Amino acid sequence: MSAAGLLAPAPAQAGAPPAPEYYPEEDEELESAEEDERSCRGRESDEDTEDASETDLAKHDEEDYVEMKEQMYQDKLASLKRQLQQLQEGTLQEYQKRMKKLDQQYKERIRNAELFLQLETEQVERNYIKEKKAAVKEFEDKKVELKENLIAELEEKKKMIENEKLTMELTGDSMEVKPIMTRKLRRRPNDPVPIPDKRRKPAPAQLNYLLTDEQIMEDLRTLNKLKSPKRPASPSSPEHLPATPAESPAQRFEARIEDGKLYYDKRWYHKSQAIYLESKDNQKLSCVISSVGANEIWVRKTSDSTKMRIYLGQLQRGLFVIRRRSAA
């Protein structure tokens, strides 16, 4: 059979259905579609395989992480237990380091406390010695001052007694009570009983002075001048006494004492103030006001520490003059 006979179509039989026509282009399209479908299935299979591999890898990594974390926890727990055991035994390095630091701080505080105690003890001893010396000095000063005050009081009393004696000698005749010469008559029966005369009072046993010594002496000298010349002068009379500045008229000064201070010549003076004391005989003394009384002041000489009493009357009449001076 030739090729033309093979390729030529067979003649159609009578009464049979007509055969379908064959197109080569359609076969190629079918084959291409099948290949595409197979390639798609292959790709899907590969993707599924990759997804499964990734899931397995993730599960494996998670297990490794959990295992690693557990291992770290166990290691850390073991380390803490080991440190706790060393701490209980006292061999932990950190514990020994901190204990050494605490011990140094303890020793430092003990040393500082001992030094502070020593310093305070020395300070207390110094204060004790200082206070003791001050107390002894104050006692000695008070003792000397008391002795001086007593001596001054005794001297004043002695002077007052001498003045009383001098006054009694000068006015002895006037002090004597002379009896009155009266003529006694017989009392008649109807006359009343005579009443004794009580107008004359007896002389006091002690003289109370309201004036200063200088004022008394000045009054006595005045009385002596007014006496009769028939009476002989006694050696203790004012004519035989040395003249004093009070005989001449003196300038009046304003002097008074208020609230424990002396107001003199428009100036105020207080206790422990340094002054100059000038007398009528032009004697100038450096003094310190020792005390201020009600009607007089006490001054202490800086040269020999003796004390003098100055009355307000003496300052007012100018028998003594007070001047200020520097405390240095």
From Swiss-Prot:
- Region Mediates interaction with USP17L2: list its residue ranges: 2-170
Q: Where is this region: Disordered?
A: 1-65, 226-252
Q: Which residues carry this modification: Phosphoserine?
A: S32, S45, S53, S228, S234, S237
Coiled coil stretches, renumbered: 66-171
Residue ranges annotated as compositionally biased, kind Basic and acidic residues, are: 56-65
- GO CC annotations on file: nucleoplasm; nucleus
Q: Where is this cross-link: Glycyl lysine isopeptide (Lys-Gly) (interchain with G-Cter in SUMO2)?
A: K69, K178, K201
InterPro entries the UniProt entry points to:
Sds3 (IPR013907)
Q: How is it modified after translation?
A: Polyubiquitinated. 'Lys-63'-polyubiquitinated SUDS3 positively regulates histone deacetylation. Regulated through deubiquitination by USP17L2/USP17 that cleaves 'Lys-63'-linked ubiquitin chains.
Q: Give the sites modified to N-acetylserine.
A: S2
Q: Biased composition, Low complexity: where in the chain?
A: 1-16
PTM Phosphothreonine: list the residues: T49, T244
Q: Which UniProt keywords apply?
A: Acetylation, Apoptosis, Chromatin regulator, Coiled coil, Isopeptide bond, Nucleus, Phosphoprotein, Repressor, Transcription, Transcription regulation, Ubl conjugation
What segment(s) does the record annotate as region Sin3 interaction domain (SID)? 188-226
This protein's domain notes: The C-terminus is involved in transcriptional repression by HDAC-independent mechanisms.
Subunit structure of this entry? Answer: Interacts with HCFC1. Homodimer. Component of the SIN3 histone deacetylase (HDAC) corepressor complex. Interacts with SIN3A. Interaction with SIN3B enhances the interaction between SIN3B and HDAC1 to form a complex. Component of a mSin3A corepressor complex that contains SIN3A, SAP130, SUDS3/SAP45, ARID4B/SAP180, HDAC1 and HDAC2. Interacts with USP17L2; the interaction is direct. Interacts with FOXK2.
PANTHER family in the cross-refs: BREAST CANCER METASTASIS-SUPPRESSOR 1
Q: Which family does it belong to?
A: Belongs to the SDS3 family.
This chain belongs to the protein called Sin3 histone deacetylase corepressor complex component SDS3
* Organism whose genome encodes this protein: Pongo abelii
